[in-house]
């Protein structure tokens, strides 16, 4: 997980995962990065808005957000629709683990996001 926070550039995606696990005692969940990114987008929009108290100004500012953060680059200026950004996904599988948790998520396909390294081989799930 090579990405870093736009709110705290010293915080990597791996550190976010580790912090979540140490502070909650629970295994991290796949949505933690995209949930974090909601706050990154909000900060970018509120900062760019002519008046952060004006809903219309904030909504318009979202259309101009183009930043790199916890989920990589999110560009709301390019679509697929105005004000919408697409996260470049990776394919994952939960694999048996010898660590603290019984299973751990491993990246098995990075064809749409080459910045994230492959961590395991894709295995059939119906075997």
Ranges and model annotations:
Residues 1-36, 48, 104-126:
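Extracellular/periplasmic periplasmic-binding protein-like sensory domains
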Residues 23-26, 53, 69-71:
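Loop/turn elements at helix/coil->beta-strand transitions in domains of secreted/extracellular proteins
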Residues 29-38, 58, 71-79:
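Short catalytic/ligand-gating loop segments at beta-alpha or beta-beta junctions
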Residues 40-48:
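Short glycine/serine- and small hydrophobic-enriched flexible loop segments
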Residues 47-60:
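Short, charged, surface-exposed loops that flank catalytic or proteolytic processing sites
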Residues 65-127:
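Solvent-exposed, acidic/polar segments of extracytosolic/periplasmic ligand-binding ectodomains
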């Amino acid at each position: 997980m090579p990405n870093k926070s736009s709110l705290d550039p010293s915080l990597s995606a791996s550190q976010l995962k580790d912090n979540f696990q140490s502070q909650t005692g629970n295994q991290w969940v796949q949505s933690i990065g995209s949930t974090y990114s909601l706050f990154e987008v909000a900060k970018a929009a509120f900062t760019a808005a002519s008046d952060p108290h004006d809903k219309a100004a904030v909504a318009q500012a979202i259309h101009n957000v183009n930043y790199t953060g916890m989920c990589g680059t999110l560009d709301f200026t390019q679509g697929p629709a105005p004000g919408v950004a697409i996260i470049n996904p990776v394919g994952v599988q939960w694999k048996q683990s010898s660590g603290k948790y019984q299973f751990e998520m491993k990246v098995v396909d990075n064809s749409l996001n080459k910045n994230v390294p492959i961590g395991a081989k894709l295995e059939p799930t119906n075997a």
